[in-house]
């Protein structure tokens, strides 16, 4: 499936699969590919009153390895971006529970989705 797909297209497909997974598991997707001058959040979702920024990592093989690409610097940036999203949407970060998750999506040998809850 993925051998002829560009890296960008693979990322979009991975994000689509992640959104489907979140919806099936009781999350409400609030925003996708939210962008500001400092960066981008892949998915912002809510479940049980918790606002969750979800970093999606896609790859062709092994659902454990794409997650290894999330560095401490990236986690710091995700935290900053989530606060910027809250500000833009006029939500007070001190009155809302926040969390950062990651979802790893791989396609070979078959579709595999792993949800890493609360990576920060």
UniProtKB/Swiss-Prot annotation:
GO terms for molecular function: nucleic acid binding. InterPro entries: Restrct_endonuc-II-like, tRNA_endonuc-like_dom_sf, UPF0102_YraN-like. HAMAP family: UPF0102. NCBIfam families: PRK12497.2-4 (NF009152). Belongs to the UPF0102 family. This is UPF0102 protein TWT_455. It comes from Tropheryma whipplei (strain Twist) (Whipple's bacillus).
């Amino acid at each position: 499936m993925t051998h002829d797909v560009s890296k960008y297209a693979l990322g979009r497909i991975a994000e689509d699969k992640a959104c489907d997974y979140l919806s099936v598991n009781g999350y409400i997707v609030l925003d996708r590919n939210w962008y500001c001058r400092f960066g981008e959040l892949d998915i912002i979702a809510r479940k049980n009153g918790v606002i969750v920024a979800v970093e999606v990592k896609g790859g062709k093989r092994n659902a454990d390895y794409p997650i290894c690409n999330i560095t401490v610097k990236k986690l710091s940036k995700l935290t900053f971006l989530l606060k910027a999203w809250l500000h833009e949407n006029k939500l007070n970060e001190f009155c809302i529970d926040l969390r950062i998750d990651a979802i790893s999506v791989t396609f070979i040998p078959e579709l595999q989705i792993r949800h890493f809850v609360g990576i920060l």
